[in-house]
């Protein structure tokens, strides 16, 4: 029976490209952390321009009580990794008529900054839904009024938050 | 109220969230309960109900991206207060400065000590002792605010005062250290014993959890133990420093039923004989009936029912509890198929409006979509502010009088099955 140490599986040779090298220091010297480099070099103003935000509902008109399904897309337009610094650990938030997650109760996220990271040219897609009911108190909801409503999506970025927003409207009939 | 009348552990309005790219996952959402000394308290619910995160939060073992957002965890143990006050005098609260170690009653050899015991302890940390040891200052009553404690103070509390039995012994034990060494390490750290004494105590602990030939097995590695023996070794680590509270996270899930019975007997014996409080996390209602005194049922990060074990089994009040009960297989049951709770746990990133259980509840009405029921006393319908274990409470609009048709289920208790808590719903 052939033993594993007889197999030359662990033979190391600097000249043979198919075997591990004796000294892998050169490999580690070539390693560049592009995420950190990009984060250090790309100016804040450009970072907020790099990310395209889009939001789309599945229909334009809904019956009262019907659930509103929507898709959110964040796309990095740059061929570089981009990191957006956010005010809270919450990467992004959706809102109905300016109320986060359709709730009139203020959100209580911790006030420590965090990051929302995109690889180069990365698209992030999220599917969400809203029940069509507005939270008016900790434990109370009411049906949304008929008429036009605005669905907004945004990243609460420290710099350039105004560029990282998108809106759409829909009708409840 | 003397210290022994107050619960050992009070959890009040605990909130823990995980911030992911998907959004805020509200794993624990306003959970309150209390555990007395020697009490066996169960937390039950489906996978993803927030049972383990509740326990990890009180041990302060939540890692990034998780955050404990709110609430209070109060641990009332005079020995914990004495140990922490001696080692971290800067954390003792006085009348003028905040802190996480609170000394409410202090005695010296000459009698009770002044109006601000915290300041006395802060000035004389080396004299602080419990009534069991010699010393000039005895802490008679006090508590620790666990969520405000420093990381070093938590390291003193964990393992020593609050011990945890983890779910999976294969991952809880380190494969490259002997089992004995892993037990002795905790003893050396917390009880300040030398190597020889720690080894002796570790062997004692192994014997206590029923490992045969403990002296020989001390130097075995975890892979040389069977699954049941590994779990017992994990329990031995938890017991090694005489904790006041053991948090057992599904301690018997990985074990066969005979070993499970032995482990449950061991936990029962500990709480009966040494007044150790046990917080048991499980999804096995049979284990709860076997071991526990009181129980909290969790759903989607919130408590939905809280009561004594007898009342929960004989008179379940929340439709989710009823669903859980009816999904237990029973010997002699003539049903073709087991009833299940239809659907799955909701996405914790976007909880349903109103009662979180309404999409799965057979009794849901329009009111359930718009009102989230608070935990109320099932007899009076009054909200339960203080988690009192004697009060049977449930979070369902049925008990606040807001349901029109009400919930309607029968609990049948069969004579032959009553001994093991069996009934069919």
Annotate each predicted stretch with a short phrase.
Chain B
Residues 21, 81, 309-424:
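Charged, flexible cofactor/metal-binding loops and thiol motifs
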Residues 159, 223, 240-241, 265:
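Conserved signature/switch motifs of ABC ATPase nucleotide-binding domains
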Residues 44-46:
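The feature captures the beta-strand-to-loop junction immediately N-terminal to the Walker
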Residues 35-36:
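Conserved hydrophobic segment flanking the Walker A/P-loop of ABC-type ATPase nucleotide-binding domains
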Residues 250-251, 255, 259-336:
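P-loop NTP-binding/switch modules centered on Walker-like glycine-rich loops
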Residues 4-8, 17-30, 61-68, 78-112, ...:
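A short, flexible loop at the N-terminus of ABC-type nucleotide-binding domains that lies
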Residues 233, 238-240:
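ABC ATPase C-loop
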Residues 76, 196-216, 325:
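Conserved ABC ATPase "signature" region
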């Amino acid at each position: 029976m052939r033993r594993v140490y007889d197999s030359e599986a662990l033979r190391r040779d600097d000249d043979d490209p198919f075997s591990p090298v004796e000294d892998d220091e050169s490999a580690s010297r070539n390693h560049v952390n592009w995420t950190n480099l990009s984060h250090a070099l790309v100016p804040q103003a450009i970072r907020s321009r790099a990310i395209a935000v889009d939001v789309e509902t599945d229909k334009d008109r809904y019956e009262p009580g019907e659930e509103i399904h929507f898709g959110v897309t964040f796309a990095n337009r740059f061929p570089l990794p981009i990191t957006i610094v956010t005010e809270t650990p919450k990467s992004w938030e959706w809102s109905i008529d300016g109320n986060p997650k359709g709730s009139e109760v203020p959100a209580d996220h911790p006030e420590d900054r965090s990051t929302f990271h995109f690889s180069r040219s990365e698209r992030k897609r999220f599917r969400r839904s809203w029940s069509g009911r507005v939270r008016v108190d900790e434990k109370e909801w009411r049906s949304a009024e008929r008429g036009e409503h605005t669905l907004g999506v945004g990243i609460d970025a420290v710099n350039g938050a105004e560029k990282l927003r998108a809106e759409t409207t829909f009708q409840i009939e | 109220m003397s210290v022994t009348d107050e619960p050992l552990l009070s959890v009040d309005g605990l909130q823990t969230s995980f911030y992911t790219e998907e959004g805020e996952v509200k794993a624990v959402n306003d959970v309150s309960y209390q555990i007395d000394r020697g009490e066996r308290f169960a937390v039950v619910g489906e996978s993803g109900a927030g049972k383990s995160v509740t326990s990890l939060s009180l041990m302060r073992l939540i890692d990034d991206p998780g955050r404990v957002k709110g609430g209070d965890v109060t641990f009332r143990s005079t020995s914990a207060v004495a140990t922490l006050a001696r080692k971290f005098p800067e954390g003792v609260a006085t009348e003028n400065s905040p802190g996480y170690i609170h000394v409410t009653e202090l005695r010296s050899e000459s009698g009770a000590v002044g109006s601000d015991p915290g300041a006395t302890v802060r000035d004389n940390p080396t004299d602080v002792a419990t009534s069991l040891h010699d010393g000039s200052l005895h802490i008679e009553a006090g508590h620790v605010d666990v969520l405000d404690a420093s990381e070093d103070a938590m390291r003193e509390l964990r393992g020593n005062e609050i011990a945890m039995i983890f779910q999976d012994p294969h991952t809880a034990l380190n494969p490259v250290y002997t089992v004995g060494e892993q037990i002795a390490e905790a003893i050396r750290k917390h009880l300040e014993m030398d190597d020889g004494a720690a080894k002796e105590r570790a062997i004692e602990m192994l014997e206590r959890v029923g490992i045969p030939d403990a002296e020989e097995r001390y130097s075995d590695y975890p892979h040389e133990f069977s699954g049941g023996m590994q779990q017992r070794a994990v329990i031995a680590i938890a017991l090694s420093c005489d904790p006041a509270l053991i948090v057992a996270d599904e301690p018997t899930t990985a074990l066969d039923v005979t070993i499970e019975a032995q482990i449950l007997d061991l936990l029962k014996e500990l709480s009966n004989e040494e007044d150790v409080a046990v917080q048991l996390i499980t999804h096995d209602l049979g284990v709860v009936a076997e071991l526990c005194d009181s129980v909290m049922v969790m759903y989607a990060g919130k408590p939905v029912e809280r009561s004594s074990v007898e009342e929960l089994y004989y008179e379940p009040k929340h439709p989710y509890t009823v669903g859980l009960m009816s999904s237990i297989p029973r010997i002699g049951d003539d049903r073709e198929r087991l009833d299940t709770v239809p659907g799955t746990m909701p996405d914790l990133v976007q909880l349903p409006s109103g009662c979180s259980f309404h999409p799965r509840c057979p009794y849901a009405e329009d009111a359930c979509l718009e009102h989230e029921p608070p935990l109320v006393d099932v007899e009076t319908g009054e909200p339960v502010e203080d988690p009192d274990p004697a009060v049977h409470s449930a979070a369902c609009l049925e008990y606040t009088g807001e349901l029109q048709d009400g919930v309607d289920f029968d609990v049948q208790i069969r004579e032959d099955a009553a001994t093991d808590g069996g009934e069919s719903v």
